[in-house]
Amino acid sequence: MCGIVGYAGRNAAAPVIIESLKKLEYRGYDSAGVTVLGSGVETYKAVGKIINLESEIPKNLKGAIGIGHTRWATHGRPSTENAHPHNSGGNPVKISLVHNGIIENYMALKERLIGEGYEFKSETDTEVIAHLLHKHIYGSPDGKEARNNLLAGLREALKEIEGSYALAVISADEQGKLVLARKDSPLVIGLGKGENFAASDVTAFLIHTRDVIFVDDFETAVLTPDSVEIFDREGKLKEKKIEKIEWDFEAAEKAGYEHFMLKEIHEQVSAIHNTLAGKVSELEGAIYLKELNLNDDEIKKLSRVQILACGTSWHAGLLGKYLFEQLAGIHCDIDICSEYRYRNPVMHEGTLAIAITQSGETADTLAAVREIMSYNCPTLAITNVVGSTITREANSVLYTRAGPEIGVAATKTFSTQLILLYLLAVKFALVRGKLSPDYVKSFITEIRKVPGEIQQILNQKEVIRECAENFACSKSYFFLGRHLSYPIALEGALKLKEISYVHAEGFAAGELKHGPIALLDEGAPVVAIATKGQTYEKMLSNIKEVKARDAYVIAVANINDTEIGKYADVVLRVPSCDELLAPLLSVVVLQLLAYYTALARDCAIDKPRNLAKSVTVE
């Protein structure tokens, strides 16, 4: 997720903006930039750390209105051209803006604007907004006279934009103003004396003011040094409540959450939405994966998928194996990367290798990818980090648009990895004639409901917290799943081990009687994923089996399941959904269970002992 700041005051804007951007460094970024309204629109950008940007900015830069941005690449590689702010207006530049979000229809808008004479300097979706705004104000690339003011032009431009945005915009022709807009991306205004602030996060300006106004979806705002005006969707001026922020800085960078992990569990709602953005069309029943360097004929010729991953990414890959085989009818193998290199794999013609890595720098995964590429096997990387090593080595790359993940234990990156695997499997199945367009339309309808369904789970997290606290002193946990829920059982056990230091094991429920049941004793907590589907009745039998050994059963089940309560001691509910998508909901419950167990045990949740976020050694 990018960081946005804006300043309208009487002091030099550049130092204030740089200071604010530094407060947002924790979010992660690959480049940064600043625009100040001085003698004109003056923009400075740099790749890498903010200190690199500081060295580009003249010490005596004047101008008391400005915007700044830290970028986490989603469209286009990290570069000065792709860094924000983005400008429009030729010579001289008229408009400069910063943007957080994803514009889903940017390619169509870009093609149209190029046809109208606008020149693009970057690979980003954001530059489209700058030129579109210029068009609505000045009429053409070389237009000099404004037909609209900045606010009116922005409103017109936003009518053409599909996607999410938090925008801060300034204009050479309206020197005293900073204009804002928001839809599905956070934006907050800070109220000062003789100065006002804007940011994607209160952290940016907390040292200047604790009085804030939160901008809501479809609202626009105009800031000057002495005033703040906020307008609703129809352009009517509206009164907004002023909030007093009591958080300290450390709490503020976590947006009020106690830990980054809890914040990132909640961010799965927006992360999944962003990962789906621009990739699915419910109307057409289509899935668009333009980054995939495989045409339909090549997809039809695939005989095998080889997944390579480690840790949490391996659990995502295991679910992916089930999806490729069940939906697309393609044989799929999955290997732990550290093992793959040493087993002398038998290669098959028509194989696609898929490497899954959160950081794109996992040493074992990179080594496995290099091994399989030595056989001339095409490779697809699924990662969260633009410009990482794997993105430079794989033939194709699909990005999880989860934003920076600070907590060591993966949460939102796991969910977004799953989203891409679902889309790949359904895309392959459609191309290969295994699924009908009508089914795909239905699938898209259902997967787009997932963010809202996750929010329902988050709304009942106190129930999960109570359950976790009751068993925080347990020495061992058992997680059971069947079919699509088996990888989720493995992931739930790993999460508990990682952050609470409790021994936990995930099992295919049908394997209990082949050994693990010997470990059960009175009161042992057993987490059984028992959402409705083809294995539901068998899971009920497994629950009865462990209850007969006096274990304590915590079931994850659908909200409308009236049967499960007869057998489980505690039921943690998830919304009823398509069986295929249930893992996306069940895992959120297990993430919260692990989090609250670790909290009750007073563990270092964001930085658990002996673990690192990116494992760059073999």
UniProtKB/Swiss-Prot annotation:
Residues 295-434, 467-608 form the SIS domain. Residues 2-226 form the Glutamine amidotransferase type-2 domain. GO terms for molecular function: carbohydrate derivative binding; glutamine-fructose-6-phosphate transaminase (isomerizing) activity. Residues 72-91 are annotated as: Disordered. Homodimer. GO terms for biological process: carbohydrate metabolic process; fructose 6-phosphate metabolic process; protein N-linked glycosylation; UDP-N-acetylglucosamine metabolic process. PANTHER family: GLUCOSAMINE--FRUCTOSE-6-PHOSPHATE AMINOTRANSFERASE, ISOMERIZING, GLUTAMINE--FRUCTOSE-6-PHOSPHATE TRANSAMINASE (ISOMERIZING). Gene3D superfamilies: Glucose-6-phosphate isomerase like protein, domain 1 (3.40.50.10490), Glutamine Phosphoribosylpyrophosphate, subunit 1, domain 1 (3.60.20.10). Keywords: Aminotransferase, Cytoplasm, Glutamine amidotransferase, Repeat, Transferase. NCBIfam families: glmS, PRK00331.1. It is found in: Cytoplasm. InterPro entries: GATase_2_dom, GFAT, GFAT_N, GlmS/AgaS_SIS, GlmS/FrlB_SIS, Ntn_hydrolases_N, SIS_dom, SIS_dom_sf. The keyword Transcription does not apply. It catalyses: D-fructose 6-phosphate + L-glutamine = D-glucosamine 6-phosphate + L-glutamate. One of its GO terms (cellular component) is cytoplasm. Its EC number is 2.6.1.16. Pfam families: GATase_6 (PF13522), SIS (PF01380). The gene is glmS. Disulfide bonds: none annotated. Catalyzes the first step in hexosamine metabolism, converting fructose-6P into glucosamine-6P using glutamine as a nitrogen source. This is Glutamine--fructose-6-phosphate aminotransferase [isomerizing]. It comes from Methanosarcina mazei (strain ATCC BAA-159 / DSM 3647 / Goe1 / Go1 / JCM 11833 / OCM 88) (Methanosarcina frisia). The active site is at C2 (nucleophile), K613 (for fru-6p isomerization activity).
